[in-house]
């Protein structure tokens, strides 16, 4: 069956705050479109639902925001049921004497709850508790019942809540988190997918990429609706960018020199100090690509390109302002390399479209076989990529049918393709 056409939205139900409902056949006359979005740099999933209605449900339910929306989608790649969407906004781009078109922007309950004063972070978080435990407790404080996929951190960190929103605090902690295994394994990502919340290190994602690839896609010029093998073909791939030397240099992708000073003790010299270079750290980190160190001219690989001076900020500063160089909280140079990893991960950005596939999620590694004009497989640009952004789109066609695609933005830090692990069983094999 074709992944492009064989989709059904079997249930759409809007429940007002006083229990009134509108659903297909009862207040909702038709569904025009549904867009679903997730990203490894977004703490919440998002969706847009476009419907037609012959009733004035905005006034009759009424709809004012935070109403519950339930959606069930059946597709050959899987059935997905969303039960806890809430309405963030509603617009009415078209209306007539017979029907109206309504567009709902949907968000998650946790995204709303984190804005409330009672859910802001106010307590002191113990500096002896692992960061991963802090992250789990912060999410649970929002009352979430979603699955939490939280990687254990090697370091602990203490801080005060300062009335921060939950997601802001987790992002702040992610930059200071270190993965187990030693070395320069700093830098975590926090995001949400349809299967729950994720908190994972860049290194662990990269190191397991070859064995955790869930799908493999092959570039084609077109897709046939009658050929099942075309369900895993790549349409219209293009690189948004492939390196951006000046911008990356200014954002410390190729190295930095950061000096820290303690505003409480005001020492005569900067301490601690951290210096990193692209060539010096390359072999110490895990990567998605398989090629050796990229050769850069003019000494870019061997010299810091971003110089900065920052105050030392301990999350729970001691009264005398002393810094313990042996503690993870007291040594920002241990986790300052996370900035370089975030930037290197964004070195290549490839956009593409595939037939809709609910087995894909942001943060999953996929294998992409790209072609070189008149030469077949391009082993330089092909290989394992990380899904950065994912958008499922369902549309009503002019003929009244449905078509559905998944738009992807994929990233990686290096070039090269030596083939995926032969022990991996792909979902489409």
What does each model-found stretch correspond to?
Residues 52-54, 107-112, 200-207, 411-414:
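Secondary-structure transition/turn motif
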Residues 64-70, 128, 214-220, 363:
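Glycine-centered loop/turn motifs
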Residues 8-10, 45-47, 67, 81-83, ...:
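Envelope-exposed proteins and targeting segments
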Residues 48-50, 106, 117-147, 161-190, ...:
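Amphipathic, non-transmembrane alpha-helical segments in extracytoplasmic/periplasmic proteins
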Residues 34-62, 218-429:
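An acidic/polar, Gly/Ser/Thr-rich interaction patch typically located in mid-to-C-terminal regions
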Residues 1-6, 81-82, 106, 146-152, ...:
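Interface-prone segments of viral and bacterial extracellular assemblies
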Residues 101, 110, 149-243:
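Short beta-strand-centered interaction patches in the first periplasmic/extracellular domains
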Residues 1-115:
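Assembly/oligomerization scaffold segments
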């Amino acid at each position: 069956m074709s992944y492009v056409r064989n989709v059904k939205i079997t249930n759409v139900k809007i429940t007002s705050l006083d229990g009134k409902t509108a659903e297909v056949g009862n207040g909702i006359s038709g569904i025009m479109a549904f867009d679903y979005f997730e990203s490894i740099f977004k703490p919440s999933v998002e969706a847009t639902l476009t419907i037609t209605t012959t009733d004035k449900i905005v006034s009759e339910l009424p709809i004012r925001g935070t109403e519950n929306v339930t959606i069930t989608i059946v597709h050959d790649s899987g059935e997905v049921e969303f039960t806890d969407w809430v309405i963030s906004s509603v617009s009415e781009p078209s209306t007539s004497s017979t029907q109206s078109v309504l567009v709902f922007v949907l968000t998650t309950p946790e995204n709303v709850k984190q804005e409330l004063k009672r859910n802001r972070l106010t307590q002191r978080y113990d500096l002896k508790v692992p960061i991963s435990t802090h992250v789990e407790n912060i999410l649970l404080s929002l009352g979430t019942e979603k699955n939490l996929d939280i990687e254990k951190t090697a370091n602990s960190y203490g801080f005060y809540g300062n009335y921060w929103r939950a997601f802001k605090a987790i992002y702040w902690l992610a930059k200071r988190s270190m993965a187990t295994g030693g070395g320069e394994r700093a830098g975590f990502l926090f995001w949400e997918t349809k299967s729950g919340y994720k908190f994972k290190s860049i290194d662990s994602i990269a190191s397991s990429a070859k064995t955790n690839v869930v799908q493999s896609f092959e570039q084609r010029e077109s897709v046939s609706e009658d050929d099942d093998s075309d369900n895993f073909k790549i349409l219209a791939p293009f690189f948004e960018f492939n390196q951006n030397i000046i911008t990356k240099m200014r954002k410390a992708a190729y190295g930095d020199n950061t000096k820290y000073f303690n505003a409480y003790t005001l020492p005569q010299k900067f301490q601690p100090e951290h210096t990193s270079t692209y060539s010096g750290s390359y072999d110490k980190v895990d990567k998605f690509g398989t090629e050796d160190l990229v050769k850069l001219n003019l000494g870019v690989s061997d010299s810091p390109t971003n110089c900065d001076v920052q105050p030392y900020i301990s999350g729970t500063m001691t009264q005398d302002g002393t810094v313990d160089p042996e503690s993870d909280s007291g040594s920002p140079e241990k986790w300052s390399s996370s900035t370089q990893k975030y930037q290197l991960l964004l070195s290549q950005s490839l956009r593409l479209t595939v037939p809709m596939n609910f087995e894909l999620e942001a943060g999953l590694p996929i294998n992409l076989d790209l072609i070189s004009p008149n030469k077949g497989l391009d082993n330089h640009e092909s290989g394992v990529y990380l899904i950065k952004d994912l958008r499922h789109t369902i549309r009503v066609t002019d003929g009244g049918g449905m078509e559905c695609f998944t738009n992807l933005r994929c990233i990686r830090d290096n070039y090269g393709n030596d083939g995926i692990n032969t022990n991996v069983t792909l979902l489409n094999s």
